[in-house]
Amino acid sequence: ETRVLRPKINWKLSIDTFLESYHFSVLHKNSINPIFYRSQTFDTYGLNFRLISPRKTIGELKNSSPASLDLLPHIVGIYFLFPNSFVIWQLDHLELWEIYPSGNTPGESVAQMSFFTPEPVRSKQEEEHWEKNLDLVMHVVENEDFPLGEGIQNGFSSQAQDYLSFGTS
């Protein structure tokens, strides 16, 4: 299934929504924070990169021998494909996010999310499971991440500052 959001955010700011998990404990306190830790690893591959964040279940591996570790059930993998796409590997499904500018309006974008399951849905129970997962993802992005981004975009658009430096230390 594919769903489309049209946030009033520049497309590059929309992409920023997915670039770190440190905000989970504040912005997503009651939604996904109980599922994930707010730490992550970062690896680059040219203009592309990968983020790995641990699920809170990772503690179950504490007493496992290194040879028997199976990390995959205890992480989420976020793969950024330059310039505008993310593949998010969850425990049991994939999400493909594609983010584009919206016409000639710099303060708007289109975010398309396609949700992929390993097998076609075969029962009402499976349909309800996947719908619940999809609804959670869309709720978090549409009602938590993007409204914050829209507030930031409003600040940019207010012209309260003469200039903005981004990416310098």
Give, region by region, the residue ranges found by the protein language model.
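C-terminal catalytic domain of Rieske-type non-heme iron oxygenases
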Residues: E1-S169
